Amino acid sequence: EGEYNILNTGFSDLTPFFTLAPWILIFLIPAVTMRSFSDEKKQGTLELLLTKPLSIWQIVNGKFLGALLLIVMAIIPTFIYVAVISNLGIPEGNIDMGSTIGSYFGLLFLIAAYSAIGIFTSTLSDNQIVAFIVAVFLCFFFYFGFEGIASVVPNIATLVAAFGMQDHFKSMSRGVLDTRDILYFTSITVVFLSFTVYNLKSFKS
């Protein structure tokens, strides 16, 4: 029971799941990424890692792809929800597949952005708890913060909300893959991975 019960909406809909998922990921992804570099720094193995015949970008991308793959694998079992909702629909198969597919694409981009943020924060401290807390804060701010700011500046609310992840995730969840939304998430991901590389280069020098 409850507002996030996907079987309790009265129609074939996965909105409760896709509404809850960003909240779960805000805590799950930082928990996965917090040790990416903070543990290396704490154990004194980061210097050794940076001397390997790999570019810093390759090292960062390896950590990023590892985290991304792990979280995506955790999301795959939720496809069962799609099958269940589709089969329970009246008539059977009465589900908005466009919206569902768009929402999953939105989740993928959201996971990538959160992962990049989490990996970046893991370079800020050798304490993984600190890395976790900072990552949670940044993910929360980028997803909910701009919506909150927009609510108190109604004259430019649309402009302010466009800086937040929630606005773009909701857009993709409508089943429309707008290049602006894809570019937004890609930019956030690349920017935070670039910050990670910069921090590691500073540490190396």
Regions found by a protein language model. Give the residues of each.
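Terminal transmembrane helical anchor/hairpin motif
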Residues: 1-12, 131-199, 203-204
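Secretory targeting signals
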Residues: 7, 11-19, 61-62, 66-126, ...
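Long, hydrophobic alpha-helical segments
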Residues: 16-39
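Hydrophobic alpha-helical transmembrane segments
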Residues: 16-17, 46-57, 77-83, 124-139, ...
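Residue-level signal for the membrane-embedded core of alpha-helical transmembrane segments
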Residues: 21-29, 72, 76, 108, ...
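Hydrophobic/aromatic residues in alpha-helical transmembrane segments
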Residues: 29-33, 81, 117, 165, ...
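Helix-loop-helix units of permease transmembrane domains in multi-pass membrane transporters
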Residues: 36-66
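Transmembrane helix-loop junction
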Residues: 39, 83-87, 123, 147, ...
